[in-house]
């Protein structure tokens, strides 16, 4: 049998080693949380630095326009020229803003009363923490036309913004006079619905520190430049440094809260099927596609096949805008 002395020593050894292991584990846990706090603090400082430096050039001035105080946030818009109303709507993307139209407005204002708008979550407009849905923009477009323009405008959209223009007209048949869509995507791209994977991406982007950091990586100057050169313009040399600065500034105005719109886009909350609405349109719908865009002819034809009154045109050497 084991002596009492050996048993006592074993218990004492177990107590000592167990205590040292517990102390070591506690120390490791403390180190982990300390490093995590330091990492979070560093990322937060990086995020704040990006926000500050992105707006230093102040390209997107607010003095040139006005604000429409909508129920979900203040909406920046401009009004120029005289004539029948023309509303220009930029692509629904947190890097975009009404700056997208800066080259065209001066020409158009000679013949129209030209309105440009920064969509909610974009540019100089408010960027609230909410889930951005297609119907949200249907409401915004409807209310803006009723409260600000006051009559039926012709509307010009770029990219995915065709969706809520068409759906708004479908819900309010006397809302618009016509829709001109520049490089709209395939109608099938609006058929997506949120799933588990897209919901995870949305949740990650909405996180306070990590989500902002991920957003800042996505909207880094080099990534925006790549998007402009490959998607927005057919010739990369047309992307000036001022234009790059404007898109970069737009993406980071409002403490990078454009991430909430990006999160909803990634989560497919801004998508909504439009085929039925295109089919029922009774106002003119003009589709303008760039020949340099992939499947441009197929995309334009799909709209025309859905509604025989749709007119299509193609432009060479042009990108999204």
Predicted regions and their residues:
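Conserved loop-alpha-helix segment in the C-terminal half of the alpha/beta-hydrolase fold
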Residues: 280-318
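Active-site loop/oxyanion-hole signature of alpha/beta-hydrolase fold enzymes
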Residues: 116-156
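Conserved HGGG/HGGXW glycine-rich cap/lid loop of the alpha/beta-hydrolase fold
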Residues: 78-124
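Alpha-helical membrane-targeting segments
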Residues: 187-234
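Conserved hydrolase catalytic core segment
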Residues: 150-194
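Conserved alpha/beta-hydrolase catalytic His-Asp/Glu region
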Residues: 217-277
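A short loop-to-beta-strand scaffold at the N-terminal edge of the catalytic core in hydrolase folds
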Residues: 67-80
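Hydrophobic alpha-helical topogenic segments used for membrane insertion/localization
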Residues: 25-50
